[in-house]
Amino acid sequence: MSATHVFYKVEIDTKDSVQPIIYFRKAKRCSTAKGADRQHNRIVNETVDAWRQFSSQIMRYTVSRVPADVVVHGDIRTA
């Protein structure tokens, strides 16, 4: 599964919360570096659009690529 997919960790820091909101996105692996860069930008833009209604409460978005073993059957390991 990890050979055909990449995983993105999305962290959203809000003004009121001590802990960030964390979730993961899975996407098909790109064959080129330029494609991977475009895919990362797409994930960032989709995240910002999805959370736009809460933008006044959000301080920071962090989207990073993580290895497949960080997300195992819904469990979160340290990335």
Residue ranges and their predicted role:
Residues 4, 28, 34-37, 51, ...:
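Intrinsic disorder/low-complexity segments
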Residues 1-3, 13, 31, 46, ...:
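Intrinsically disordered/low-complexity terminal segments and short unstructured peptides
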Residues 1-26:
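Short aromatic-glycine-(Arg/Gly/Cys) micro-motifs in beta-strand/loop hairpins
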Residues 6-12, 30, 36, 40, ...:
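Hydrophobic beta-strand residues in large extracellular and virion-surface proteins
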Residues 41, 45-79:
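Short, mixed-charge low-complexity intrinsically disordered segments
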Residues 17-46:
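Short, flexible N-terminal segments of the mature chain
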